[in-house]
């Protein structure tokens, strides 16, 4: 509120905080304002206001009910286990073993089994063009919502004249990265190199030791250089040091998000599922096979049964210990192979008909297998048009992912590439 006395503006202001609630279409509200005199500043004598006309100008800011991002997504979503506008299968619902299409999913879907939760999981699938967003002056694609009503988004480059139509290298960070690089604490042949964070250097001949290591929930103090700074922290022994790709992600976050934009983010779980396969390609059967597999490979290659549940608490990467392992410095990570499968990027036989398609490879954070002939661990990646897996030493694109807090509002836009959502807290 600003004031004038007999038409003369004065340097006197007052602010009224109205509860953050939705008033609906009617915005008429009555509020009582009281001042105490003398007032600090130029007008410190109440006599100055006697027999004068005082004009109060009110500027109100707010939002229309239902204009928050979560509600906008919710209003578009349909169940994924029924036939709908872009789902028409003999067995009703989306078939995740097949590529997305006009008859197998294109839009926003409610994950079956979560529809009655306080915050159901909504996810985008297929060649959609209504999940584009600008946050922290960068373009992002909305991937899915979280169990707390947050909104997980993935990096998609820099806006051009307010538009977000990036593909190829423009959709990734400038620096490509190996998932893990050889150093004094790790090698490409170490079984622990599939970790987004990793512990001891353990070779294939020591695989019994590796199985024991994966059960180690102990902690110790570790020192490493992360995002250009030396830090010493107590971490789980399995998560002592940051992988090469994590260092790239954390450095970018520190330089571009931390200072001005981190308040809009939630501390969600980033799942680096290191659970071992219990099937034919288990680590115990390695001598008679060409590789041993992780549980993610069983879910996404042997069958197509993606999951958004992280089975091992030690693999739930978070900043806080209240909802995960507490070993992260910043609330940022990579997508999982399961998440991009829901988005429409699956194993062999898929096409590039997904909003995540960029024409170039980029890392996700789900371990796949250890290959005997190359003596190297493999992690899943987006392989130009489908889900692939490659050795951790390969340098591929990096697309950081963050999760916006529940309650983020849409300032403008409709989510298209030409008119992306602009969001505010």
Describe the function of each predicted region.
Residues 16, 20-23, 68-425:
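Long, domain-scale functional regions
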Residues 1-12:
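Surface-exposed interaction patch
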Residues 17-70:
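C-terminal, structured domain-capping segment
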Residues 9, 39-41, 62-66, 159, ...:
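Residues that cap or initiate secondary-structure elements
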Residues 9-11, 43, 139, 386:
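Short, solvent-exposed loop/turn motifs
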């Amino acid at each position: 509120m600003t004031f004038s006395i007999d038409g003369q503006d004065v340097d006197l202001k007052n602010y009224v905080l109205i509860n953050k609630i939705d008033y609906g279409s009617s915005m008429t509200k009555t509020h009582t304002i009281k001042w105490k005199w003398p007032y600090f500043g130029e007008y410190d004598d109440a006599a100055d206001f006697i027999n004068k006309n005082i004009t109060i100008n009110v500027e109100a800011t707010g939002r229309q009910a239902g204009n928050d991002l979560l509600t906008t997504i919710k209003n578009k979503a349909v169940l994924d286990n029924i036939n709908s506008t872009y789902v028409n299968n003999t067995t009703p619902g989306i078939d995740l073993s097949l590529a997305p299409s006009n008859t197998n999913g294109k839009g926003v879907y409610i994950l079956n089994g979560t529809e009655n939760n306080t915050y159901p999981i909504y996810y985008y699938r297929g060649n959609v063009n209504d999940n584009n967003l600008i946050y922290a002056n960068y373009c992002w694609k909305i991937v899915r919502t979280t169990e707390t009503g947050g909104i997980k988004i993935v990096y998609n480059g820099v806006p051009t004249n307010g538009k977000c139509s990036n593909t190829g290298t423009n959709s990734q960070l400038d620096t490509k990265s190996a998932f893990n690089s050889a150093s004094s604490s790790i090698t490409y042949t170490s079984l622990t190199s599939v970790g987004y964070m990793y512990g001891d250097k353990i070779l294939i001949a020591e695989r019994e030791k590796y199985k024991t290591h994966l059960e180690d929930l102990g902690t110790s103090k570790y020192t490493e250089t992360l995002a250009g700074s030396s830090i010493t922290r107590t971490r789980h022994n399995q998560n002592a040091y940051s992988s090469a790709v994590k260092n790239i992600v954390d450095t970018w976050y520190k330089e571009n998000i931390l200072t001005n934009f981190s308040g809009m983010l939630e501390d969600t779980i980033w799942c680096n599922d290191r659970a071992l396969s219990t099937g034919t390609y288990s680590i115990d059967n390695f001598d008679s096979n060409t590789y041993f597999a992780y549980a993610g490979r069983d879910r996404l290659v042997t069958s197509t049964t993606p999951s958004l549940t992280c089975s091992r608490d030690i693999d739930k990467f978070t900043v806080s210990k209240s909802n995960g392992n507490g070993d992260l410095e910043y609330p940022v990570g990579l997508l999982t192979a399961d998440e991009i499968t829901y988005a429409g990027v699956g194993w062999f036989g898929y096409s590039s008909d997904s909003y995540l398609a960029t024409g170039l490879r980029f890392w996700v954070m789900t371990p796949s297998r250890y290959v005997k002939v190359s003596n190297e661990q493999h992690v899943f990646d987006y392989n130009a048009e489908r889900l692939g897996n490659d050795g951790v030493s390969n340098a591929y694109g990096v697309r950081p992912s963050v999760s916006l807090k529940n309650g983020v509002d849409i300032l403008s836009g409709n989510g298209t590439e030409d008119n992306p959502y602009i969001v505010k807290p």
